[in-house]
């Protein structure tokens, strides 16, 4: 964790920001610290603090070694964690505070401003700290992806005509947890037949029929890092029209993969795949982006691969 605290402090120095408040579970996971709702991280240019309430103090003392643990007791003081943040900011003479905009309530924002502290919304900047992965992160994700592939192979062995989408989803969940996943990366998507046209189709009681497409889209978290796999399978031979579309999508995916290289922009990769689908006459149905980053990912991850993305790809970025 010390390496990532240092990375944040280097960022604060570079941007001339006095402190950074971290509330999101994603960034707390990235820092390998406590992730509970009563655990907040405050990093200044010189120190790092883990602010916890009484529910987390015992666990914090057992697990936390790089951040100074500070207990706040809202039941005695009548104030939330911002009372402790205020004390630290005053002690270290901080005048500017970076925050994650999507995590800080309007009321909290106003409380901080009343202290005379300039509040800076730094969502993109904080995300950028994580966008290029370290070697150990990549290894964790490779393991996560390998486990995901094994789970998929186990699931498809059990799929049969008459099985419901709910049952397929239940198998995915079971084999994921049985294989060592901490949790699912996102709600599992299972769609069959005409429902495979729904990119985020949640499972229903619809039953599998022979020769029709079965779409399974799921991922797991392993050592906090996620996988994300989408696969299409069939019982028996698919309808010729469906096979044609499948082959177009596969060709587009391979074109996108070929376009991924350091120096390319996210929109270049999207275009490489989109051109294939448009040339085949299906462009109007490709009404979403090509892909997105992978990582801890609970609140989204860069780089984005869509028709507007100006993100320049770098070595050790991970994406789906």
Identify the residue ranges that each predicted region occupies.
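Active-site neighborhoods and metal-handling regions in enzymes and metal-associated proteins
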Residues: 1-320
């Amino acid at each position: 964790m010390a390496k990532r605290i240092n990375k944040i402090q280097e960022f604060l120095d570079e941007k001339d920001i006095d402190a950074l408040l971290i509330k999101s579970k994603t960034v707390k996971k990235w820092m390998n610290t406590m992730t509970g709702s009563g655990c907040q991280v405050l990093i200044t240019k010189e120190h790092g603090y883990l602010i916890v309430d009484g529910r987390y103090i015992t666990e914090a003392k057992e697990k936390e070694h790089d951040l100074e643990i500070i207990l706040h007791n809202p039941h005695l003081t009548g104030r939330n964690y911002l009372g402790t943040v205020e004390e630290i900011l005053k002690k270290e003479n901080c005048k500017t505070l970076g925050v994650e905009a999507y995590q800080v309530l309007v009321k909290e924002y106003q409380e901080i401003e009343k202290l005379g502290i300039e509040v800076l919304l730094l969502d993109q900047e904080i995300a950028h700290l994580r966008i290029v992965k370290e070697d150990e992160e990549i290894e964790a994700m490779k393991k996560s992806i390998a486990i995901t592939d094994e789970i998929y192979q186990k699931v498809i062995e059990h799929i049969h005509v008459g099985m419901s989408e709910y049952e397929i989803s239940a198998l995915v969940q079971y084999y994921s947890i049985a294989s060592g996943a901490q949790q699912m990366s996102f709600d599992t998507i299972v769609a069959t037949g005409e429902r495979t046209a729904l990119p985020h189709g949640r499972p229903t009681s619809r039953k599998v029929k022979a020769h029709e497409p079965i779409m399974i889209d799921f991922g797991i978290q392993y050592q906090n890092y996620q996988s994300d796999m989408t696969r299409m399978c069939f019982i028996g031979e698919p309808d010729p029209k469906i096979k044609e579309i499948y082959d177009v999508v596969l060709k587009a995916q391979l074109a996108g993969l070929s376009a991924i290289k350091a120096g390319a922009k996210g929109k270049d990769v999207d275009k490489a795949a989109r051109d294939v689908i448009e040339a085949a006459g299906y462009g109007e149905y490709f009404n979403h982006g090509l892909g997105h980053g992978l990582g801890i990912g609970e609140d989204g991850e860069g780089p984005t691969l869509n028709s507007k993305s100006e993100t320049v790809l770098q070595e050790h970025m991970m994406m789906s």
